[in-house]
Every structure is written in C-alpha cells, then in structure tokens.
Curated annotation (Swiss-Prot):
InterPro entries: MinE, MinE_sf
Keyword field contains Ubl conjugation: no
Family classification: Belongs to the MinE family.
A Pfam family per the record: MinE
Keywords linked to the UniProt accession: Cell cycle, Cell division
Lineage: Bacteria, Pseudomonadati, Pseudomonadota, Gammaproteobacteria, Chromatiales
Domain of life of the organism encoding this protein: Bacteria
NCBIfam families assigned: minE, PRK00296.1
The protein, known as: Cell division topological specificity factor
Amino acid sequence: MSWFNYFRATRGNSARTAKERLQIVIAHERIDRSGPSYLPRLRGDIIEVIRKYIEIDEDQVKIQMEQEGDMDVLALNIQLPDASPPLSETRHSSKQ
C-alpha cells in the first residue's frame, strides 16, 4: 500500500505543477498578443507629431510590435495623403 501512495502523491504534485506552468504560458501569450501597455499612448504621441506637418486621419496609422529574433521591432504604417502644401504654408497663406 505504501508504494501506491508514494506514486499517487507524486502524480498529483506533477499535475499541479503542469497546470501552474500552463497558466504561466497562457498569461505570457496574452501579454504578447495585446502588446505593451504603453502602445496606445505611443500611437497617440506619434499621431500628434505627424499632424504638426500633415493632415492625417487616426485610422490611417497602424502600429504594431513584432519580434525578430531577440529584438522587439516597432512597425509603423502610415497612409499619407496626396502631395499637398504643408500645414504651415497653408496657414500662412490664409492669413494674408
């Protein structure tokens, strides 16, 4: 009987350990999918800077984090409008 109890206790312990490890893996995958917590603020700051120079719609800016090897890469895709005078030039000409 003592042999059965010995193996049973180990099995229960390993199942618990496996469950904890799986929960850790799932938590890491969720974090990776959602991206860093600062990404929305970074997106807003980037849009603000771009708007100093050209008029864009927020929907035209796509930002995502990618992993290439051991490096995190910030991928930025901006749909620019057709060539038009910069905002500063249009503002100056409208004042005259």
